[in-house]
Amino acid sequence: MQDVLGNPAGVSSAETWGSWSEKADLGLNIVIVDDQMSARTMLRHVIEDIAPELKVYDFGDPLDALSWCEAGRVDLLLLDYRMPGMDGLEFARRLRRLPSHRDIPIILITIVGDEPIRQAALEAGVIDFLVKPIRPRELRARCSNLLQLRQQSESVKQRALSLEQRLLASMNEVEERERETLSRLARAIEYRDGGTSAFLERMSHVAGLVAEQLGLSEEEVRIIEMAAPLHDMGKIAIPDSVLLKPGKLTEDEMNVMKRHPRIGYELLSGSQNRFIQVGALIALRHHERYDGSGYPDGLVGEAIPLEARIVAVADVFDALLSARPYKEAWTMDAALAYLYAQRGRLFDPRCVDALLRGRAQLEQICGQFSTASARPGV
């Protein structure tokens, strides 16, 4: 025997819902769209009998239903094909255009023999069909199955999102370790050259500021900031008698000093790490000059990699602000005036202009990473 809704005698609709519902979050929304009130009432009655926790919303006007769906969450949609104003196929097409509703299960209610309509419905995104006259037991079974699949799909999405977040956190941790390693390596070279970590931090952030003002992507700015401190890596192979000499270098000593870009490149090249790859390029080219007067290869203009042109400006700006045994620290105004005077000669005009546009941020950077031997004074 069966009850009036088609359940076997003694078996409730809640029991036919399936054991999965015992552990599932039943905050699911079912939307019914049918212009006939009697049909909506019957559908609502059957669906609410599946489980009392389900929330059912019914609409006689397809446009009202579509407006509600645009703003609300939908887990299952029952849709009549023949409705005035907008048929079920057009409704399905419009719903599928909404990014958050592209995978909602849709059941289309049709009449027997509507095979062309079925084909068009599948193309419009309909998942399943109910044929009039609707049998309550079949309606419950189809809704239960699709809701179960919907719940499982959402669970998989949440798990994937959680795994993605954990992976991103792990990648960030690895990147932070790489950043620290590169920073300490660069600081070792800077200490040997008589500088401090504040100089490196300042130069790195100035390079990032120039890159940002040039309109580079956030990722490109980050890579340049991390790679910039590696620019003088080759100085590790320069003798102290040359590197630490307080006076002017002789021609022979200058030739020795000019080896450090290639040495730095050789030390850093061949890495699979993106930051070190860019660092190798910067190490090799940061002493090239826009007019071709630089070294090691006398490259001209945009033949010099953009990363190196950016770091060339940041490096000289930082060097001018830094006190050394052979010179006093310059003020920020004097340093910027020098860079402007050399735009188009030693430096890429776009990079100099980018630094000048970021004057406010530049003052903040210099204030944050100022030292006793550097005067950012304006």
Swiss-Prot record:
GO terms for biological process: phosphorelay signal transduction system. Keywords: c-di-GMP, Cytoplasm, Hydrolase, Phosphoprotein, Transducer, Two-component regulatory system, Virulence. Its EC number is 3.1.4.-. The modification 4-aspartylphosphate is found at D80. SUPFAM superfamilies: CheY-like, HD-domain/PDEase-like. The keyword NAD does not apply. Changing Y295A: Decreases interaction with GGDEF domain. It is found in: Cytoplasm. Gene3D superfamilies: 3.40.50.2300, Hypothetical protein af1432. Phosphorylated and activated by RpfC. Residues 29-147 form the Response regulatory domain. Its main location: cytoplasm. Residues 174-371 form the HD-GYP domain. GO terms for molecular function: phosphoric diester hydrolase activity. It catalyses: 3',3'-c-di-GMP + 2 H2O = 2 GMP + 2 H(+). One of its GO terms (cellular component) is cytoplasm. Interacts with a subset of GGDEF domain-containing proteins. Contains a C-terminal HD-GYP (modified HD) domain, which is involved in degradation of cyclic di-GMP. The GYP motif is required for interaction with GGDEF domain-containing proteins. PANTHER family: CYCLIC DI-GMP PHOSPHODIESTERASE TM_0186, CYCLIC DI-GMP PHOSPHODIESTERASE TM_0186-RELATED. Member of the two-component regulatory system RpfG/RpfC, which is involved in the perception and response to the diffusible signaling factor (DSF), which is essential for cell-cell signaling. Detection of DSF leads to the positive regulation of biofilm dispersal and the production of virulence factors. Activated RpfG degrades cyclic di-GMP to GMP, leading to the activation of Clp, a global transcriptional regulator that regulates a large set of genes in DSF pathway. May also directly control genes involved in biofilm dispersal. This is Cyclic di-GMP phosphodiesterase response regulator RpfG.
